[in-house]
Every structure is written in structure tokens, then in C-alpha cells.
Amino acid sequence: MTENINEFRVNNFGAGPGCIPTEVLLEAQKELLNFQGCGKSIMEVSHRGKEFEGVINETKSNLKKLLSISDDYDILFLQGGASSLFAGIPMNLCENGVEDIVDFIVTGSWSKQASNDGKYFCKVNKVVDMEKEKFLTVTEPQSWKFSPDAKYVHYCDNETIHGIEMPISTPDHLPSNLIKVCDMSSNFLSKPIDVNKFDLIFAGAQKNAGISGITIVIIKKSLLLKTKPNVPSVFNFLKKSQNNSLDNTPPTFNIYITGLILKWIINKGGLSEIEKLNIAKAHALYEYIDNSNSFYKCSIDKNYRSRMNVVFRIQDGNTELEEKFIKEASKENITDIKGHRSVGGLRVSLYNAITIDQTLILINFMTNFHNNNK
């Protein structure tokens, strides 16, 4: 059945919503009309009923298992995309509003937007701002300028648009007394992480953890007790925690899909095995690009190249060839490789569901395109 489906499914390298594992789609299809024999679709069950209570609790349990999340943390499932938390986090953590300072590490479009949105709720200090360098690299942490009185520090672990991924050691370079907030939207569940190094992690699900419309939050319980009480319910972290994210109707189907994906990751051997595959895919593609005699070029500092989002140009920005590349790739069932409108060029997203074989199909196409367009 899976093989037959793969005959008509394209190689989707889109940045998000990203590719979903075929096994997950088939499981959702199988249960769509009659979830666990209850006579209703998962989309129809009450969020307060026993069926969905089982779904949300199992999803939380499996996420804790995969990331070794201790009982010092709670997991929230919030409606909407991760960018909603660019407002939601300072609303919860800045009790004095715009008088409170928040440190932002600006390494790409999403951390830039977080700092821009943050100014409505706090005083923004840009610890480092890499826009002058066109978001091609990140300066060494020793040069970062933190505020002594900052409420928290915010950074984006993987910049989807610019193809920048921060090193695993980044939290070790942040002041120990600062609350550490990390946007992991586009590399969440792509590798093991030490959750204990963070106070709050958040991620939109539509890359590696599900479908669009839900944001996952991992937050220290001690931090929950410090949140402002006068925050609207939809953003009130403490209220969400106290009600198991069920104080109003959550995106039930989205949580269900996240649950299926977590089971898929567990069946694949967990995050260590997933990381090995992601390293292999990224290495193969970057190595090919770097050895193409500059026909393809990735200008991102090699120390910060994203495993998830590979951005590159053809002949230093030959837009005519890039459009031709996209058009011809589509004929070979290779889709969603156009760069973000703000930067142009090409972008290949190698999320968990993308296989090594699919990556090699892309590289083979790139080789043929190069040979035919020298």
C-alpha cells in the first residue's frame, strides 16, 4: 500500500507545512471515520471526552519520553502558529510591560520578527543583530552584549528562511541567571536536546511535529508560577497548564497528528536515530553543492549551516536559471524548492519525513541540470 502511494506522491521539500511521513497519513486515513471504534471521527470527538483525553495524555507522555522531559516541566498545546508567542511570551513574563528589558539574539527573519513584535510588550535589547551581515553568519558569543536586568533572553535555534542553525552549545553561552527562551519551530524533534538547559521551548508543529495550527510549549513549572495573572486566556500559560490545555477547545485533530508522528519517531528508534539520518541528508546535499564548481553556491557560514533548511543560489543568483531549475524539477516530481520571497534563490527543507533516497533523487536532478546548463 505504501509503495503504491509513493508512486503518485511528489518529493515535497517545502519549508512548511512540511512533508508528513506516509505511515502517519495512512494511519490517520484508517482512523478518520471511526476513531478507535467509537463510531466517530477524531475530528468529532469531544475535547473533554475519554477518547481525546487519552490522545492528549499519550501525546504528552511520548513527548516526555523522546526528549527526557522531567516532571519539572509542563507541556502545553496552544492554538495558532509559533509567531503568536512573539507576543504571548512577553505578555506572560514581563510583569512591568514595556519597562521590562528582554534580550534578543537576532540571527534571521524569525528572531527579527520576535524582537519587532516584542517592542509592544517590553523594552527590546538586541544582544547581537546579524542583519548587517545579511544573516549569513553569527558572531562569537563572547561579543554578545546582554542586559544585566533582562527578564529573559530569546533566540531562534533554526532560522527557516535564511538557513542558519545555532550550535547545540548555544545555551551554555547564555548568562546562567537569565531565563532562557528558545524558538525551535523548524528543528524541533530533529535531534536530541537537553531540555534542562532551557526555561521555555516553543515550536510550531508544521515542520517535524505535525500540521499547521498548533504550537507546542515546554515550560518550567517554576516559571509558570511567575507569569502575570492578567493575561488573556488564549495566551495564559498558567491557565493552560492548570487545565491540561483544555480550558477551551484545542486543535484536537492537530494534537492527534502530533501524537501519531511521535509514535513514528519512537518506531524509528528515537531522536538519536533521526539525527543520524538528518546529518546524512544534509551532508550529502551540502557536499554536492560545495563541489559543484560554484554552479550551486551556499553562502552560509559552514559553522551555522542548517540541517533542516538548505538555502543556495545558482551562479551567484542567476534568476533565469533558478526559475528554470524550479520548473524542470517540478516535472521530475521535486516540488516546493523556491526560496522565501524575502531572500529569493532556492531552499530545500530536509525535515524528518524526507528520506535519504529522496535527497539522492534531488542531487541526481541537480547533477543533470548542472550538466545541461553549463
UniProtKB/Swiss-Prot annotation:
Q: What does the entry list as the binding residues for pyridoxal 5'-phosphate?
A: A82, S83, W110, T160, D183, Q206, N248, T249
Q: What are the names of the required cofactors?
A: pyridoxal 5'-phosphate
The EC designation for this entry is: 2.6.1.52
Instruction: Establish whether keyword Disulfide bond is in the entry.
Output: no
Write down a Pfam family by its short name. Aminotran_5
In the record, biological process GO terms are:
L-serine biosynthetic process; serine family amino acid biosynthetic process
The biological pathway it contributes to is: Amino-acid biosynthesis; L-serine biosynthesis; L-serine from 3-phospho-D-glycerate: step 2/3; Cofactor biosynthesis; pyridoxine 5'-phosphate biosynthesis; pyridoxine 5'-phosphate from D-erythrose 4-phosphate: step 3/5
InterPro entries in the record? Aminotrans_V_dom, Aminotrans_V_PyrdxlP_BS, Pser_aminoTfrase, PyrdxlP-dep_Trfase, PyrdxlP-dep_Trfase_major, PyrdxlP-dep_Trfase_small
Query: GO CC terms on record?
Result: cytoplasm
Q: Please share the entry's free-text remark on the cofactor.
A: Binds 1 pyridoxal phosphate per subunit.
* Catalysed reaction, written as an equation: O-phospho-L-serine + 2-oxoglutarate = 3-phosphooxypyruvate + L-glutamate; 4-(phosphooxy)-L-threonine + 2-oxoglutarate = (R)-3-hydroxy-2-oxo-4-phosphooxybutanoate + L-glutamate
User: Per its UniProt record, what Gene3D superfamilies does this chain match?
Assistant: Aspartate Aminotransferase, domain 1, Type I PLP-dependent aspartate aminotransferase-like (Major domain)
PTM N6-(pyridoxal phosphate)lysine: list the residues.
K207
Into which EC class is this enzyme placed? Answer: transferase
Residues holding L-glutamate: R48
Top-level division of the source organism's lineage: Eukaryota
In its UniProt record, a GO molecular function of this protein is: O-phospho-L-serine:2-oxoglutarate aminotransferase activity
Keyword annotations for this protein, in alphabetical order, are: Amino-acid biosynthesis, Aminotransferase, Pyridoxal phosphate, Serine biosynthesis, Transferase
Q: What does this protein do?
A: Catalyzes the reversible conversion of 3-phosphohydroxypyruvate to phosphoserine and of 3-hydroxy-2-oxo-4-phosphonooxybutanoate to phosphohydroxythreonine.
How this chain assembles, per its entry, is: Homodimer.
Q: Which family does it belong to?
A: Belongs to the class-V pyridoxal-phosphate-dependent aminotransferase family. SerC subfamily.
Q: Per its UniProt record, what NCBIfam families does this chain match?
A: PRK05355.1 (NF003764), serC_1 (TIGR01364)
Name used for this protein in its record: Probable phosphoserine aminotransferase
Organism source for this protein?
Dictyostelium discoideum (Social amoeba)
